[in-house]
């Protein structure tokens, strides 16, 4: 399977690329779109929602939650991996349906998400912080680069006699690392490379994509439907292949543009 580059036919169209909601594991689900990944984690005592997607596809997310047998009010926490709109625009409408839910973001993105979207996070996490909901403890790792406050998320998930080591790179996009991008900040490439190195030390055998093109979410969903006996999301090498891809992709663009750092 060739992985990672996004599909051009839906690039830039947040309302396109609707995916049927599905279970990655029995307790880990996808309810997003091709353009904006959204995951639900069933902790045994409510749901954790990782990112909320765009405002104009929020209806699809809500329908997806119900279609999988949950209710929006089951959401106890909303994790924002970084402040960009494709990850946070759905936060405010989600809170109207889950008013008791607590919002969570990385310490260096909290001001920006408030300035841009009026979201005042309930919990601001820093490197190595943990948060327990139900039976699951989530660990946050600061991985700046895509934004200065990007956080990646790791947790162990027990199911069917096995414990899965689940991980998500909270901001893998490389466009923001270059000066022609509105979200570029000085030092972002160096931060990004350091983040990649840190992430390589994590143990991950179930990689959740921060976007579908991070791990070919859509193709894996189709493969699971065709053969439910094999779960293509379970792969002890894929996370590291993706990190290598990210590193090479940035280095190649730097070379093309004559950049040394």
Enumerate the language-model features and the residues they cover.
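Short, glycine/acidic-enriched loop or turn micro-motifs at the edges of active sites
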Residues: 30, 45, 54-55, 85, ...
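Acidic/histidine-rich helix-loop elements
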Residues: 4-5, 11-17, 52-55, 116, ...
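Active-site HxH/HxHxD metal-binding segment of metal-dependent hydrolases
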Residues: 28, 56-59, 66-130, 239-242
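Metallo-beta-lactamase
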Residues: 54-56, 130-132, 137-241
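Divalent metal-coordination and catalytic microenvironments
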Residues: 27, 41, 51, 82, ...
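C-terminal regulatory/interaction regions
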Residues: 236-261
């Amino acid at each position: 399977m060739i992985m990672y580059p996004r599909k051009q036919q839906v690039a830039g169209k947040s309302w396109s690329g609707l995916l049927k909601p599905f279970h990655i594991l029995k307790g880990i689900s996808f309810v997003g779109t091709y353009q904006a990944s959204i995951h639900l984690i069933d902790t045994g005592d409510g749901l954790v929602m990782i990112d909320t997607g765009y405002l104009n596809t929020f209806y699809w997310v809500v329908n997806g939650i119900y279609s999988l047998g949950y209710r929006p009010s089951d959401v106890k926490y909303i994790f924002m991996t970084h402040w960009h709109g494709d990850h946070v625009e759905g936060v405010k409408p989600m809170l109207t349906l889950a008013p008791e839910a607590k919002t969570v973001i990385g310490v260096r993105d909290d001001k920006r998400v408030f300035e841009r979207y009026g979201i005042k996070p309930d919990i601001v996490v820093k490197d190595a912080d943990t948060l327990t909901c139900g039976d699951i403890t989530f660990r946050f790792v600061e991985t700046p680069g895509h934004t200065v406050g990007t956080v990646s998320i790791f947790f162990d998930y027990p199911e069917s006699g096995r414990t899965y080591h689940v991980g998500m790179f909270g901001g893998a996009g490389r466009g923001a690392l270059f000066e022609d991008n509105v979200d570029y900040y000085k030092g972002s490439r160096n931060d990004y490379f350091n983040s990649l190195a840190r992430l390589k030390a994590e143990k991950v055998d179930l990689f959740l994509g921060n976007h579908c093109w991070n791990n070919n979410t859509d193709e894996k969903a189709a493969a699971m439907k065709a053969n439910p006996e094999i779960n293509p999301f379970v792969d002890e090498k894929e996370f590291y292949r993706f990190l290598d891809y990210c590193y090479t992709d940035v280095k190649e663009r730097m070379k093309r543009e004559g950049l040394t750092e």
